[in-house]
């Protein structure tokens, strides 16, 4: 872990050195204010380090201070700063540290690369290097060898951060994962390789964004300080301000769309960021959404838009990597009872946290928010209350209007359009808890592969995009289509309820009441096992797929059996009561 507390500021003096591990570390003083320039009027470098909870952060900070004595360094853990807060600090350089796990587990790191690449010079070290590869669409795979504190010879191209560096150089490696060369994005180029053929250096072809898989800050790495110095010597690129040039991007995007040309993931991100920052006019937003629909949205376009929505949302910290969501697109018009919401309580009863993202009615007569509210659930919570509830009960409803404040910029255009737009598809894949396991119901099978691609681009671990034929839920009323989505592949499947030991159901029994209180009573009856077989087994089928996705059960059939047991034993209904009783412990809003 990095020295001192998260979010500390270091102002280096000429010739400073760091030693010790307290907040009063020798060689620097902590200052509360900005450090835009020194008393002599020289503009100072501002370096923000994203700390991925790794002890090497200390060494990186020390090296930065030694090679650039007149600089300001601020260190923030990867879950304790937002994109907007970084922008306000106007850094001249950003460093993404090493750390445990994979890029998609590294908090804000991936979003930092996607947002600031091309605006601010970025250096990623080890995990940070993998973050860069992943952020632009590369795959992170197991290395040929697991190395911990071992040295290798690194051959490099002598450019960028390797300018003037000994070639080959001996470098220290601590990693079990690498960026896969076969899936390397077109925008990235390899700048260094190890003697065993692994990628050791990357650089964006157009941006000052660099990654090194090895540790330049290790004492056993040759010329590590020169690599750091080369990075810091890159001419500062200030964060782009809203300008006419930015507006041209949305106009250019519109021109492409009306010619039925697809946008890339990054292009859709740029347009979405412009829109969600409040810089687009209602006419531009409406034109973009209509043109996108007329051309037909792609998975990359939806993924790019969703990634910005996630960045702009209020982040909810999940209590477990296995936290799931059961949110669908709605829009099927069939008017089913609240299947996905009921499913959530069965899943939570098994000890798997459910961060249920949702809103009021879309296609059902009563939306998930409506039915929960009818049972006494408090929708208006602070983010801290949601996190606490999720941790203590295993369930929390993430009421979308509270957690997506940037949506205010698009609502006027959406209200005036009154047609289906890309935003009708984005809800399920923009969960503020950044869940990695989901069952995403889709009202139209033609959108399934697009949402699957978007989920893959967003870093899902193991999710399913499903369609029940006449509804955006899995049902026992016929065969269901399912796309299994992992980081490596998208696999189509057909689920036949009868092959899972379930009886063919009657679609009419899935229709729900129009009164929220009656809808809540129906949910209670299903969770008690007192509802019709079609209703109970449909919920069990959806929960069973979740159990299979998160690895709770080896097969979907086993998952269905587990779900039925949780209903029959009363555990599912008990979880509902626990969550509703928990609401009484919360203050009135």
Curated annotation (Swiss-Prot):
Keywords attached to this entry: Amino-acid biosynthesis, Aromatic amino acid biosynthesis, Glutamine amidotransferase, Glycosyltransferase, Lyase, Multifunctional enzyme, Transferase, Tryptophan biosynthesis
Subunit structure: Heterotetramer consisting of two non-identical subunits: a beta subunit (TrpG) and a large alpha subunit (TrpE).
Functional summary from the UniProt entry: Part of a heterotetrameric complex that catalyzes the two-step biosynthesis of anthranilate, an intermediate in the biosynthesis of L-tryptophan. In the first step, the glutamine-binding beta subunit (TrpG) of anthranilate synthase (AS) provides the glutamine amidotransferase activity which generates ammonia as a substrate that, along with chorismate, is used in the second step, catalyzed by the large alpha subunit of AS (TrpE) to produce anthranilate. In the absence of TrpG, TrpE can synthesize anthranilate directly from chorismate and high concentrations of ammonia.
EC number, as in UniProt: 4.1.3.27, 2.4.2.18
Family in the record: In the C-terminal section; belongs to the anthranilate phosphoribosyltransferase family.
One protein family per Pfam: Glycos_trans_3N
Name this polypeptide is given: Bifunctional protein TrpGD
Region (Anthranilate phosphoribosyltransferase): 253-589
Coiled coil: none
Superkingdom of source: Bacteria
Binding of L-glutamine, residues: 99-101, 130, 176-177
MF annotations from Gene Ontology: anthranilate phosphoribosyltransferase activity; anthranilate synthase activity; magnesium ion binding
Domain Glutamine amidotransferase type-1 per the UniProt entry, residue ranges: 46-241
SUPFAM superfamilies reported in the protein's UniProt record: Class I glutamine amidotransferase-like, Nucleoside phosphorylase/phosphoribosyltransferase catalytic domain, Nucleoside phosphorylase/phosphoribosyltransferase N-terminal domain
Active-site residues from the entry: 126, 215, 217
Annotated pathway: Amino-acid biosynthesis; L-tryptophan biosynthesis; L-tryptophan from chorismate: step 1/5; Amino-acid biosynthesis; L-tryptophan biosynthesis; L-tryptophan from chorismate: step 2/5
Annotated catalysed reactions: chorismate + L-glutamine = anthranilate + pyruvate + L-glutamate + H(+); N-(5-phospho-beta-D-ribosyl)anthranilate + diphosphate = 5-phospho-alpha-D-ribose 1-diphosphate + anthranilate
Record-linked InterPro entries: Anthranilate_Pribosyl_Tfrase, Class_I_gatase-like, GATASE, Glycosyl_Trfase_fam3, Glycosyl_Trfase_fam3_N_dom, Glycosyl_Trfase_fam3_N_dom_sf, Nuc_phospho_transferase, TrpG/PapA_dom
Keyword Transcription regulation part of the UniProt annotation: no
Lyase listed as a keyword: yes
GO biological process, alphabetically ordered: L-tryptophan biosynthetic process
Organism: Thermotoga maritima (strain ATCC 43589 / DSM 3109 / JCM 10099 / NBRC 100826 / MSB8)
């Amino acid at each position: 872990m990095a020295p001192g507390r998260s979010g500390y500021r270091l102002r280096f003096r000429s010739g400073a050195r760091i030693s010790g591990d307290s907040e009063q570390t020798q060689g620097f003083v902590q200052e509360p204010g900005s450090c835009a320039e020194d008393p002599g009027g020289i503009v100072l470098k501002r370096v923000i380090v994203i700390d991925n909870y790794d002890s090497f952060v200390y060494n990186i900070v020390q090296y930065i201070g030694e090679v650039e004595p007149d600089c300001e360094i601020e260190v923030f853990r990867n879950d304790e700063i937002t994109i907007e807060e970084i922008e306000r600090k106007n850094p001249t350089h950003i460093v993404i540290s090493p750390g445990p796990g994979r890029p998609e587990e590294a908090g804000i790191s991936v979003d930092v690369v996607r947002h600031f690449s091309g605006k601010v010079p970025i250096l990623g070290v080890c995990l940070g290097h993998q973050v860069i590869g992943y952020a632009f669409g590369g795959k992170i795979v197991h290395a040929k060898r697991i190395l911990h504190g071992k040295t290798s010879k690194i051959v490099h191209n002598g450019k960028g951060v390797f300018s003037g560096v000994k070639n080959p150089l001996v470098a220290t490696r601590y990693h079990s994962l690498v960026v896969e060369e076969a899936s390397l994005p077109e925008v990235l180029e390899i700048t260094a390789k190890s003697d065993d053929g692994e990628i050791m250096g990357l650089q964006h072809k157009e941006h000052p964004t660099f990654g090194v898989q090895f540790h330049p800050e290790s004492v056993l790495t040759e010329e590590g300080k020169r690599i750091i110095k080369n990075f810091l010597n890159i001419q500062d690129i200030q964060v782009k301000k809203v300008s006419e040039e930015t507006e041209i991007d949305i106009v250019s995007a519109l021109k492409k769309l009306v010619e039925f040309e697809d946008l890339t993931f990054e292009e859709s991100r740029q347009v979405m960021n412009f829109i969600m920052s409040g810089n687009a006019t209602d006419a531009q937003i409406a034109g973009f959404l209509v043109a996108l629909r007329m051309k037909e949205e792609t998975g990359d376009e939806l993924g790019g838009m969703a990634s910005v929505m996630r960045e702009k949302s209020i982040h909810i910290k999940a209590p477990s990597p296995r936290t799931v969501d059961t949110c669908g697109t709605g829009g099927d018009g069939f008017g089913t009872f609240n299947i996905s919401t009921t499913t959530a309580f069965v899943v939570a009863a098994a000890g798997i946290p459910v961060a249920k993202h949702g809103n009021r009615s879309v296609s059902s007569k009563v939306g998930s928010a409506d039915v929960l509210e009818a049972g006494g659930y408090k929708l208006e919570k602070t983010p801290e209350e949601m996190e606490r509830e999720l941790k203590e009960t295993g369930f929390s409803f993430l009421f979308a209007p509270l957690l997506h404040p940037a949506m205010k910029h698009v609502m006027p255009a959406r209200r005036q359009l009154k047609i289906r737009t890309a935003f009708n598809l984005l809800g399920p894949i923009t969960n503020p808890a950044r869940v990695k396991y989901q069952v995403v119901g889709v009202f139209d099978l033609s959108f399934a592969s697009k949402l699957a691609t978007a989920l893959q681009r967003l870093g899902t671990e193991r999710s399913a995009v499903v369609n029940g034929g006449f509804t955006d839920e899995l049902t026992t009323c016929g065969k269901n289509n399912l796309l299994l989505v992992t980081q490596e592949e998208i696999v189509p499947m057909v689920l036949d309820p009868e092959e899972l030991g379930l009886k063919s159901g009657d679609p009419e029994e899935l229709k729900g009441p129009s009164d929220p209180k009656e809808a809540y009573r129906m949910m209670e009856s299903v969770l008690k096992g007192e509802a019709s077989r079609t209703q109970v087994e449909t919920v069990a089928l959806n929960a069973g797929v979740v159990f299979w996705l998160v690895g709770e059960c080896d097969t979907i059939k086993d998952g269905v059996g587990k779900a039925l047991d949780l209903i029959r034993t009363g555990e599912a209904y008990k979880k509902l009561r626990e969550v509703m009783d928990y609401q009484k412990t919360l203050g009135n809003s």
